[in-house]
Amino acid sequence: MAHTGRMFKIEAAEIVVARLPLKFRFETSFGVQTHKVVPLLILHGEGVQGVAEGTMEARPMYREETIAGALDLLRGTFLPAILGQTFANPEAVADALGSYRGNRMARAMVEMAAWDLWARTLGVPLGTLLGGHKEQVEVGVSLGIQAGEQATVDLVRKHVEQGYRRIKLKIKPGWDVQPVRATREAFPDIRLTVDANSAYTLADAGRLRQLDEYDLTYIEQPLAWDDLVDHAELARRIRTPLCLDESVASAADARKALALGAGGVINLKVARVGGHAESRRVHDVAQSFGAPVWCGGMLESGIGRAHNIHLSTLPNFRLPGDTSSASRYWERDLIQEPLEAVDGLMPVPQGPGTGVTLDREFLATVTEAQEEHRA
């Protein structure tokens, strides 16, 4: 790892829970969201702070973790293991939590905040420490389930005109072929994908096969999050490539999935796999199989979005990610700097760490809970 030799100490931590209203109603096969509860972890050391965002939800709909469970684990287990300690690098912070199983999203909050803290201590951009070299990354948009086909086409048109380089439609049983057909007829040449969020079973293979007609880049996570065998069987029955999201929580999962033929693309979400170090390992495994990765989103504020952008500078991020402009989601973000795409390209924030600054003044107005921890 580059830039070794500079130790850093974690002296204190803050847990902040904020509530941000979304600018629009976002519907997936999981349900409808009108706001986002945003748990933040802020690590302090030697006059510098590193910040990370938790992407778990109030209920265990995406993976097993919940906000309440993650915060309990931070308070009672993870923070006591690192506060007051000095570390050589963020991977050493992750190693301090190595005896505990699972809970990758909670673990990622600690590890990602440590990466930001270390990068700021060194005065180096996070992406550089991770091994990335891009100054901007390709981005697309993820569009929720709309009221009808025309509403879908109108929303797609709006984002195509803004220059986004990939359109992803959320689908579910009963709302799949119709919006895809309408979108493809209106936009024959766009890069189009769909995301099912595990809403189907192998019995729906015939229905999903109908999507082969519409030149999709991939179908994302059509089947159960823990079923690689059926994903592999589905991949044999349809032409459209499968992209795995929830099914891949580690580099080991990625190796199994790709070896089985359960998918040919991986949606890499840094929090889902436990942090940046494991994300790099997933990235490398996928690259060894010739499988591209792209960075998925979880309706993050600018804190999580900045982490995602820096991770996306690694070379095997070869498809547009979900890191679209923050202004799509929020009237006001939790950071001071705007994260705005131009013609489908998101500039990588410059400066040490994630390159963004927490807007403490605004954060105070949307904070629901706050606590401080010291060694």
UniProtKB/Swiss-Prot annotation:
Outcome (variant: A182C): Retains 88% of wild-type activity
Cofactor, how bound (note): Binds 1 divalent metal cation per subunit.
UniProt: Mg(2+) binding residues: D195, E220, D245
The EC number(s) this enzyme carries: 5.1.1.-, 4.2.1.113
Cofactor(s) listed: a divalent metal cation
Record-annotated membrane-spanning stretches: none
pH sensitivity of activity: Optimum pH is 8.0.
Active site: K170, K269
GO biological process: one example: menaquinone biosynthetic process
Outcome, altering Y100C: Loss of activity
Keywords: Isomerase, Lyase, Magnesium, Metal-binding
Isomerase listed as a keyword: yes
Reactions it catalyzes: N-acetyl-D-methionine = N-acetyl-L-methionine; N-acetyl-D-phenylalanine = N-acetyl-L-phenylalanine; N-acetyl-L-glutamine = N-acetyl-D-glutamine; N-acetyl-L-tryptophan = N-acetyl-D-tryptophan
GO molecular function, one term: isomerase activity
Catalytic temperature dependence: Optimum temperature is 60 degrees Celsius. Stable at 55 degrees Celsius. Retains 80% of activity at 70 degrees Celsius.
Effect caused by changing R120C: Loss of activity
Record's description of how this protein is used: Can be used in concert with an aminoacylase to produce enantiopure alpha-amino acids, a process that has potential industrial applications. Introduction of inter-subunit S-S bridges is a feasible and robust approach to increase the thermostability of the enzyme without losing catalytic efficiency as long as the active-site remains viable.
Amino acids binding N-acetyl-L-glutamine: S142, K168, L169, K170, K269, L299
Protein name according to UniProt: N-succinylamino acid racemase
Species assigned in the record: Deinococcus radiodurans (strain ATCC 13939 / DSM 20539 / JCM 16871 / CCUG 27074 / LMG 4051 / NBRC 15346 / NCIMB 9279 / VKM B-1422 / R1)
Organism lineage string: Bacteria, Thermotogati, Deinococcota, Deinococci, Deinococcales
